[in-house]
From Swiss-Prot:
Its main location: cytoplasm. This is Small ubiquitin-related modifier 3. Residues 15-92 form the Ubiquitin-like domain. There is a cross-link at residue 11 (Glycyl lysine isopeptide (Lys-Gly) (interchain with G-Cter in SUMO)). Belongs to the ubiquitin family. SUMO subfamily. It comes from Danio rerio (Zebrafish). Transmembrane segments: none annotated. Polymeric chains can be formed through Lys-11 cross-linking. The keyword Cytoplasm applies. It is found in: Cytoplasm; Nucleus, PML body. The gene is sumo3.
Length: 94
């Protein structure tokens, strides 16, 4: 029989990141997400929680649009970073 030791470092607190999602109305929703999880999961959860359609809003981080396939690791997000949410503007004429 071989002794199985628990593998250290597999589950670390660094696997997760706390992110804030700030709406235009001043509301802030916090999420805990894995660094390598696509942000689409967070986006969909935010929309469900706020009663919004994902097609009606845009998510931005540091002024740059976020794609559904982006991950916190790819965007070099750090703990407690904030994602901004904007209503998509439609139409408009002079």
């Amino acid at each position: 029989m071989s002794e199985e030791k628990p593998r250290e470092g597999v589950k670390t607190e660094n696997d997760h990141i706390n992110l804030k999602v700030a709406g235009q109305d001043g509301s802030v929703v916090q999420f805990k997400i894995k660094r390598h999880t696509p942000l689409s999961k967070l986006m969909k959860a935010y929309c469900e929680r706020q009663g919004l359609s994902i097609r009606q809003i845009r998510f931005r981080f540091d002024g740059q649009p976020i794609n559904e396939t982006d991950t916190p690791a790819q965007l070099e997000m750090e703990d407690e970073d904030t994602i901004d949410v904007f209503q998509q503007q439609t139409g408009g004429s002079c």
